[in-house]
Amino acid sequence: MIMQRILDEKQKAAMQKDGSTLKYMYSVAGAGKGLAAGGWTLLVIGLALTAMVSTAGVPQMLVMGAVTILPGVLLVLLGKWKQDQRDHGWVQAYAECSGISEADVLQADAEFLDSRTAVVGVWGGDKNAKKKAGFVSPNYFKVPGIWPRLYRLQDVSACFFTDQFICEDGGYAKAVVIYGTSPERCTEIVDVSEKRAAEIIGAVKAAAPSVITDRCFQYEGQTYDALEQREQVIALYNRVMGQSAQ
């Protein structure tokens, strides 16, 4: 049995920025962070240099330290401003990257607080691990990683593991592959262990039992390989779901 990671209210509250979990997760990336980090580096160097030479009474070096500090302060402020500007557009970013409406983005964000929502992909001990996490709510799937990618569960046709995902360099990698209800809506979570893949797939399956979770399967006497037959598998899912809705 795959254990789902259900957080309590206090734990979920810690995964929010300005009252939003998706904004909190979106803030994991951005050019502003790089600028601010560079600014802090200059500040540390400048302060260390100033402290070192001020006791030695070297006016020229003291000025050099001060000159290093000022650009550092400016970079920190500029980085914070750029990051705030980026984070402000989180709703639009999720909508555009996911191909869903902004109303869906806001609904998914609200469902994070639902008691049935399972958090997936909290791996590693770095401070941004939770920001890179995903979650499966009653109606939505936020894909783990730094990209603002959301699926409506009703739009997920397949979510399966493979150890034969072909990378850009021609090698193979372990991955969770996610198909939407059209061939263009596909996502891969690459370099994921089988155990971690099972965590993600198990959460999706629990919330949406109709999703295909096996790479290879048989239906009506025909064998399918979801990795090699993406369009056929998506078409099969749409046909079966269409028949069940009638």
Predicted regions and their residues:
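Anionic N-terminal interaction surfaces
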Residues: 2-5, 80-136
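Acidic, Ser/Thr- and proline-rich intrinsically disordered linker/docking segments
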Residues: 160-246
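Cytosolic juxtamembrane N-terminal segments of multi-pass membrane proteins
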Residues: 1-32
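Alpha-helical transmembrane spans
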Residues: 25-87
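Short amphipathic beta-strand/extended segments with alternating polar/hydrophobic composition
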Residues: 92, 150-154, 186-192
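Short, exposed beta-strand/loop patches in secreted or surface proteins that constitute
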Residues: 128-137, 149-151, 178-180
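Short beta-strand segments that buttress and anchor functional surface loops
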Residues: 26, 142-144
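Phosphoinositide-dependent membrane-docking surfaces
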Residues: 141, 150-166
